[in-house]
Amino acid sequence: MTDIDARLREDVHLLGELLGNTIRDQYGEAFLDKIEQIRKGAKADRRGSMDAELSASLNQLSEDELLPVARAFNQFLNLANIAEQYQLIHRREETQAAPFESRVLPELLARLRNEGHSAESLARQLARLEIELVLTAHPTEVARRTLIQKYDAIAAQLAAQDHRDLTTAEREQIHNTLQRLIAEAWHTEEIRRTRPTPVDEAKWGFAVIEHSLWQAIPHHMRKADQALFAATGLRLPLEAAPIRFASWMGGDRDGNPNVTAAVTREVLLLARWMAADLYLRDVDHLAAELSMQQASDALKARAGDSAEPYRAVLKQLRERLRATRNWAHASLTATTPAPADVLHNNRDLLDPLELCFNSLHECGMGVIADGPLLDCLRRAVTFGLFLVRLDVRQDSSRHSAAMTEITDYLGLGKYEEWDEEQRISFLTRELQNRRPLLPAHFKPSADTAEVLATCKEIAAAPGASLGSYVISMAGAASDVLAVQLLLKESGVLRPMRVVPLFETLADLDNAGPVIERLLLLPGYRARLQGPQEVMIGYSDSAKDAGTTAAAWAQYRAQERLVEICREQQVELLLFHGRGGTVGRGGGPAHAAILSQPPGSVAGRFRTTEQGEMIRFKFGLPDIAEQNLNLYLAAVLEATLLPPPPPTPEWRHLMDELAADGVAAYRAVVRENPQFVEYFRQSTPEQELGRLPLGSRPAKRRAGGIESLRAIPWIFGWTQTRLMLPAWLGWETALSKALERGEGELLGQMREQWPFFRTRIDMLEMVLAKADADIALSYDERLVEPDLLPLGAHLRDLLSQACSVVLGLTGQSQLLAHSPDTLEFIRLRNTYLDPLHLLQAELLARSRRQNVEQGSPVEQALLVSVAGIAAGLRNTG
């Protein structure tokens, strides 16, 4: 057993014991014995004995016991997560190696210096990096903000008990605090009774910044600066902000009628309020600390006749921040003109801070300047006055419908009936026309009015508060031009990045020609004024074609875009729309970035961070810092040491794998007439739509699999542990390649091609979490007899996938090379197994009894969904 295993088990045992005390206090010893019997049964079952007994004890639970049993195992899993997260950041002995996340940047910089990169070029490249992490809301982020704060406090107590020199009384005090926090969490309802609004989701995102990223960014920058100095003798300039944040929360209206123009306006104002409030706290601390009198002439000129010039300048800034916060707050309820002292430009925030910083250095007080003042400056450069840049996202069909209404009103015919050439000709002409397209008396329908109102909000908002306008389900050049025209008509006079999102297999294959067409159109380059941004969709392409074909289509699309932009001498910014799960393009960010096509990460990288992964990757400051380090190092490495392009043999084999993969995937998902009904019966998919998990509906419209959003599609299969979308297709594709005698070539690709290695590693990870026996238990409780053979067939395919991956990696067990990860999975299974069996029982009762919303069965079902999501650490 490794050191991490032993410590992790100790912490989990302690937290479990304290939770047991809490449960005993509420329900008595007999009930706690029942929980313990179920837990031990699950543990024994993993060793192959008591399955029937475990199922029977769960099936015999009375209606009153369902919810507390589900809650007990849900809380066990959340506490196991806290212990695991803490193990990633716990205090290490001097003799132990620092974790990879801490070493990765210093080691990379040393390697780059050894390979001949000059100190100046490295410092310049690091300072110029543009990495943007786009925080998105997530229907399956089931943990409430209240509980997340309690979990963070529990993690802090685990850290406190790690100190070697604690007295017995101090250790006892920590245990008492842990007991109280666990009791508070247990007695707090873990599930929302009502769906969160888009504004609630945005506030959740701001809370992650306030409680974690606000601390993590300056610490991360300080360490990056130290690593750069150690390797080159140079420092990061004050204006460097290699990692910034954007958000979709309150801006993503694709398929979500609850995100309106008014919501977008409210979220933009809340971000300004929150930013001003956070800077006020910083400036208050600085004013208390910077009591020095000696100052530069420039600072004295700004401070006026003051014996404490730093405090005088900071007081002026404090007044302006207070005015900004008060104005933003007042504007939430009524349109309020901004007073003269409201901050509008980031320079207004930076100038007084830089003045103080430079003055302290000039006067020999650099050690003071480089403390909290430098941290505040780093935050101001990273977060600015608007905290995050808000993207707007809408479906291309909404823009086409608006254009049709406009052209029909003007007597020009129906835009949607025109071919692509007619559309481009009309849009190009109107974009260059100085007169407005819309007459003042035009009365649009409600849908078109909402599209236009959103464009007007964009026009009214400060440019620096906004990111990109993303067009989902984009497929043609006219999709981009239509948005540019609607923005122009609404008074958007500055350039705004209008970004096509290519999501299906066909659209990914067509991405290159679409961008090439745009770049050759008259006037398009002038409107661009910056890089051409293109978003690559991972979720819908995988749902459409399976991950084998989708991954290769994404790779080829990026290669073609790099080539076209190079030919056209335009900079390219690729925006990766990844989910938290492998079926939605998720996986370790560091490996994913290093597996991108050569030239596609040229100092720029933009990616979505999904709701439930935001908490795991950025919820605690120390863990956030580790993940920021990984992003920074990976983007720098991919920029300066891009991987080699694949050989013709690798390409040919990848083409074959993709073709075999998509055929196998679609044979099951699209061509088997029983498949949709099997999916609905064997997973909680139907019930997920009823649960108050997010502000967005689970379906785009009525219909089969294609109408389902990618998230509930993945979520359903994850809950039953079949994990089908992440692996289906690979088992056939790899088996056929081996039958053709291409095993050696597959091994070479895995060894030498980061793209292929990363795909196989992520496939192995998801197969290690999949569990055919758990999936079978759902079938036995929920599926009609005529559909059972399909379930058996899918489990056979899962077994085939496991065998072929083991053959390829030369291991006897999945993840044998990663004992820590295996231990984390094993530890959780003891608590997950009862929840899966309980969920199958709850689904059976719910469907049989047609239960009311809010009933104990429905509540317990919700808790089981939350617990399994927490236990698997990725959901949809």
Curated annotation (Swiss-Prot):
Tell me which cofactor or cofactors this protein depends on: Mg(2+)
GO BP terms: carbon fixation; oxaloacetate metabolic process; tricarboxylic acid cycle
Keyword check for RNA-binding: no
Could you say which EC number(s) this protein's record lists?
4.1.1.31
Instruction: Name the keywords, alphabetized.
Output: Carbon dioxide fixation, Lyase, Magnesium
What's a Pfam family in this record?
Answer: PEPcase
Record keywords: Lyase included?
A: yes
Catalytic activity, reaction form: oxaloacetate + phosphate = phosphoenolpyruvate + hydrogencarbonate
InterPro entries, per database record: PEP_COase, PEP_COase_bac/pln-type, PEP_COase_Lys_AS, PEPCASE_His_AS, Pyrv/PenolPyrv_kinase-like_dom
Catalytic-site annotation from UniProt: 138, 543
What does the entry list under GO cellular component?
cytosol
One GO MF term on file is: magnesium ion binding
Family annotation (HAMAP family): PEPcase_type1 (MF_00595)
Q: What does this protein do?
A: Forms oxaloacetate, a four-carbon dicarboxylic acid source for the tricarboxylic acid cycle.
Give the family from UniProt.
Belongs to the PEPCase type 1 family.
* Name of the protein described by the UniProt record: Phosphoenolpyruvate carboxylase
